[in-house]
Amino acid sequence: MKIEKLGKSSVASSIALLLLSNTVDAAQNITPKREKKVDDKITLYKTTATSDNDKLNIFQILTFNFIKDKSYDKDTLVLKAAGNINSGYKNSNPKDYNYSQFYWGGKYNVSVSSESNDAVNVVDYAPKNQNEEFQVQQTLGYSYGGDINISNGLSGGLNGSKSFSETINYKQESYRTTIDRKTNHKSIGWGVEAHKIMNNGWGPYGRDSYDPTYGNELFLGGDKSSSNAGQNFLPTHQIPLLARGNFNPEFISVLSHKLFDTKKSKIKVTYQREMDRYTNQWNRSHWVGNNYKNQNTVTFTSTYEVDWQNILLKLIGTDSKETNPGV
């Protein structure tokens, strides 16, 4: 496709908001831009920006690919968002007797937005649709005149007509990728959410699964088990990696800038983790499991200024927040 188509909070409240903006917990770096003349029409400029927050355990690696195409009347930016988002997993207390709980990574969100007027718009992105594959692999190719093609696989079927390509490759066992409903020409968002988790051959279960007798059996050990509550969960090694470890996102957004229009604009990149609380409880005859969604949310945002005329990148600032810190 051608890329031009396209209130006050109560003191007694259980929700606390922790704001961490430009603190010692955040570190940033931008590499010098590298220039590559692809051919007589296209020149590629690349720079990488890293930004993280140790307290929230979120790390952004952003690759900015600026494409100057003499055969096209717009600047093109292919932005690859990668890095790491930790699940925040907190194990149960094995000594808990009749009731126990643990926290796990239920969903991860990544978004890219253009914070400017209509001079800079989001015109394409990858993945483009809901995806339930174990491993998501796609290739974006650019050719003369602003033509963008997105194909499955790491080769993407590129041929001699493609002047530039970028790939995404990430694993999401038992999770699925969805596109944010608010996606439009100014913003694109992806969600990677626990979707189909098996429990010793039973299931699949999700964050909202429910049985009238046993509740949500997502991580329940045994409904008649004689173990303590703190030991009656699915063994840790059987819990999906994204639920207890780290998610390594790789998403691509394509932004278009009108030549001779706004010289500078802002781009905002946000990484977020939603942490659920899973519980089990003995009800005098059997164990009952429950999952409580989004009990703790951490969000890390980096805002960059893009100088389209000189092809320069500047970090304006970072913002971090956490609901229910310390759970």
From Swiss-Prot:
The keyword Secreted applies. Residues 1-26 form the signal peptide. The keyword Signal applies. One of its GO terms (cellular component) is extracellular region. It is found in: Secreted. GO terms for biological process: cytolysis in another organism. Induction: Expressed at the late exponential growth. Is cotranscribed with lukE. InterPro entries: Bi-component_toxin_staph, Leukocidin/Hemolysin_toxin, Leukocidin/porin_MspA_sf. Keywords: Cytolysis, Secreted, Signal, Toxin, Virulence. Its main location: secreted. One of its GO terms (molecular function) is toxin activity. Toxicity requires sequential binding and synergistic association of a class S and a class F component which form heterooligomeric complexes. LukE (class S) associates with LukD (class F). LukD can also associate with HlgA. Part of a bi-component leucotoxin that acts by forming pores in the membrane of the target cells. LukE-LukD is as effective as the Panton-Valentine leucocidin (PVL) for inducing dermonecrosis when injected in the rabbit skin, but not hemolytic and poorly leucotoxic on human blood cells compared to other leucotoxins expressed by S.aureus. HlgA-LukD is a Ca(2+) channel inducer. Belongs to the aerolysin family. This is Leucotoxin LukD. It comes from Staphylococcus aureus.
